[in-house]
């Protein structure tokens, strides 16, 4: 009897679309274990502003790959792929189906397609580039990048120091340009993937949900959560954790950049922009994907159950 490729489920969608609620219901019905695919939920101490599942929700459906990093730590798509593959293998070994839930599309892409063989960050090289920038300015380093990697220089704004640094770092470490290395792909995913995306059919409903959820976060103590982070000397707005939507706006409010009402307005706008980017990415997704309606959760659940049952029968 030939070995069958194991099944995994992707449940994607924009922020505030109801992914967590649906995942919890699926966990009660199907032999699945949940893996979070969210670049904000990885951070400890960032619970309210990330809409992290509550203790009650996690008791019903434990999520792997949440609370695995301190906000000061870096975590890449490559880190996620390595961690997710380990968790998926562990779930399959237990006779269950991995259910990957979240809205960080870059993580899904890395998982499906593998990653180009880019070197890990090297603090010594990065520091040398920073020192060079202090002497010459980032515009001069952008010109240097244009000679090494014209394609990357076209994509990267001359003021985007972080991306200029990374592109130069890659060249200094490997002798090859970022553009050249990015064209090389890694290993594909050894799973049969059922891919679903959930969102309301009417975009205005999602906008309303985002506004209501942000207001609820404020009521739940989001400001106090960010104040604890703000008081830490090792955290700043250049860190990925502090650039998460909502956190940046609250941080800037605490710094005195604008008043409370403006912070709420900017936080809601930033979250809506994130949702728009997520939907745009999903609309352009090159893999087969079935769309589910956020306002018809029972129907969405039955659609996924039917797909899993069908594939299980075909593999048996």
Swiss-Prot record:
Marked site (Interaction with substrate tRNA) residue numbers: 104, 126
Alphabetical list of Gene3D superfamilies matching this protein: 1.10.20.140, P-loop containing nucleotide triphosphate hydrolases
InterPro entries documented for this protein: Dimethylallyltransferase, IPT, P-loop_NTPase
Entry GO MF terms: ATP binding; tRNA dimethylallyltransferase activity
Cofactors, names only: Mg(2+)
One annotated GO biological process: tRNA modification
Recorded catalytic activity of this chain's protein: adenosine(37) in tRNA + dimethylallyl diphosphate = N(6)-dimethylallyladenosine(37) in tRNA + diphosphate
Residues where substrate binds: 15-20
UniProt-annotated binding residues for ATP: 13-20
Annotated stretches, region: Interaction with substrate tRNA: 38-41, 162-166, 243-248, 276-283
Protein function: Catalyzes the transfer of a dimethylallyl group onto the adenine at position 37 in tRNAs that read codons beginning with uridine, leading to the formation of N6-(dimethylallyl)adenosine (i(6)A).
Family: Belongs to the IPP transferase family.
Self-association and partners: Monomer.
Protein name: tRNA dimethylallyltransferase
Naturally occurring in which organism (per UniProt): Pasteurella multocida (strain Pm70)
């Amino acid at each position: 009897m030939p070995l069958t490729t194991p099944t995994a489920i992707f449940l994607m969608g924009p922020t505030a679309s109801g992914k967590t609620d649906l995942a919890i219901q699926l966990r009660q019905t199907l032999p699945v274990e949940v893996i979070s695919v969210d670049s904000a939920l990885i951070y400890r101490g960032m619970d309210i502003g990330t809409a992290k599942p509550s203790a009650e929700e996690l008791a019903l459906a434990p999520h792997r790959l949440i609370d695995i990093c301190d906000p000061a730590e870096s975590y890449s798509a490559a880190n996620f792929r390595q961690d997710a593959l380990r968790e998926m293998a562990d779930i399959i070994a237990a006779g269950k189906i991995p259910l990957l839930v979240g809205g960080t599309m870059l993580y899904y892409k890395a998982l499906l397609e593998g990653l180009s063989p880019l070197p890990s960050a090297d603090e010594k090289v990065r520091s040398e580039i920073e020192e060079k920038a202090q002497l010459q300015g980032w515009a001069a380093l952008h010109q240097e990048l244009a000679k090494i990697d014209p394609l990357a220089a076209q994509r990267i704004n001359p003021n985007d120091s972080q991306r200029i640094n990374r592109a130069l770092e890659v060249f200094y470490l490997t002798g090859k340009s970022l553009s050249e290395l990015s064209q090389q792909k890694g290993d594909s995913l050894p799973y049969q993937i059922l891919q679903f995306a959930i969102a309301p059919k009417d975009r205005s409903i999602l906008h309303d949900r985002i506004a209501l959820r942000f207001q609820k976060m404020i009521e739940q103590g989001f400001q106090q959560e960010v104040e604890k982070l703000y008081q830490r000397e090792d955290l700043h707005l250049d860190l990925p954790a502090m650039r998460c939507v909502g956190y940046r706006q609250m941080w800037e409010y605490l710094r005195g950049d604008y008043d409370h009402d403006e912070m709420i307005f900017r936080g809601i706008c930033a979250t809506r922009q994130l949702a728009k980017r997520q939907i745009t990415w999903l609309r352009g997704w090159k893999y087969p994907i079935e769309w589910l309606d956020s306002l018809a959760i029972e129907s969405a659940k039955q659609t996924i159950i039917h797909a899993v049952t069908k594939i299980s029968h075909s593999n048996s």
